[in-house]
């Protein structure tokens, strides 16, 4: 599902809202979530899951074209951990 698909589905379920209102709401929600993560905050949506940052330590990598060693800096990466209800729902649907 893409962001456009999400907006389309929400608009069809909530016909009293315009496409523009739904689009603005989805964009604002994603912006708020991204800003929270950028500030190091953890986001928890009960029954769905949580978003947090995981630290990746500095390491030595290789340039795929030349094979040369490349020093890679440490960095934070977004991480999603599904909640129990989401895991159970996904497993039930794929059983």
From Swiss-Prot:
GO terms for biological process: DNA recombination; regulation of DNA-templated transcription; regulation of translation. Keywords: DNA recombination, DNA-binding, Transcription, Transcription regulation, Translation regulation. GO terms for cellular component: chromosome; cytosol. GO terms for molecular function: DNA binding; structural constituent of chromatin. Signal peptide: none annotated. SUPFAM superfamilies: IHF-like DNA-binding proteins (SSF47729). Pfam families: Bac_DNA_binding. Disulfide bonds: none annotated. InterPro entries: Hist_DNA-bd, Histone-like_DNA-bd_CS, IHF-like_DNA-bd_dom_sf, IHF_beta. This protein is one of the two subunits of integration host factor, a specific DNA-binding protein that functions in genetic recombination as well as in transcriptional and translational control. Belongs to the bacterial histone-like protein family. Heterodimer of an alpha and a beta chain. HAMAP family: IHF_beta. This is Integration host factor subunit beta. The lineage of its organism: Bacteria, Pseudomonadati, Pseudomonadota, Gammaproteobacteria, Alteromonadales. The gene is ihfB.
